[in-house]
Amino acid sequence: DYRKVDEQFDRIVSVGMLEHVGYPHLEEYFRKVDELLTDDGIALIHTIGHVDVPSPTSTWIDKYIFPGGYIPSLSEVSAAVEKTRMWAADVEVLRGHYGPTLHHWRDRFEAALPKVREMYDETFVRMWRFYLVACEAAFEEMFQGVFHLQLAHKQYAVPTTRDYLYQPGERDRMLHAAQ
């Protein structure tokens, strides 16, 4: 439970967790990231998000797939970050990546159906198919996207461009700079 962590870190990476925090806890989550991040640290938050205005969670998904989950909009995430000492050093919206990912997950699910049916009933199989197809469509039609937020306390903690990502060895140097 991230709320029980007291140690500070120079790097924090959160992948696919924010969606499970729930809307009522967005500000609490970012306050905790702020508290856990050292003054010269960098946090990377990877989350699914609404690419348009804030929207409620599907009642079906809330009931059957992710109870209490919430897909935030970028405006909601930004508002929560603004209430901390952190600033968004970089924001990237991965537009076309997650739809094909969900399609591959669905293909793998279908290929594994004999094993799945040993563990789950037909109701689960139908619900999971529906979930994967609906989410794939949401990404393909750009209702949802994936956001990468790079957060920091200090401007000097992060490079001024993304060039380091594409230079051999430089990415590793950045990742291990604090060691």
Stretches found by the model and what they are:
Residues 26-29, 45-47, 53:
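Serine-hydrolase catalytic core recognition
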Residues 15-19:
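Residues lining the SAM
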Residues 48-159, 173-174:
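Substrate-binding/catalytic lobe of Class I Rossmann-like enzymes that use SAM or dcSAM, i.e.
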Residues 27-42:
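A short glycine-rich, Lys/Arg-flanked "PGG" loop and its adjoining helix->strand segment in the class I
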Residues 2-13:
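A short acidic, Gly/Pro-enriched loop at the edge of an enzyme's catalytic core
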Residues 12-13, 33, 136-139:
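Ligand-binding pocket scaffold of soluble enzyme catalytic domains
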Residues 163-179:
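Short, cationic low-complexity segments
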Residues 4, 20-21:
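A short His-aromatic
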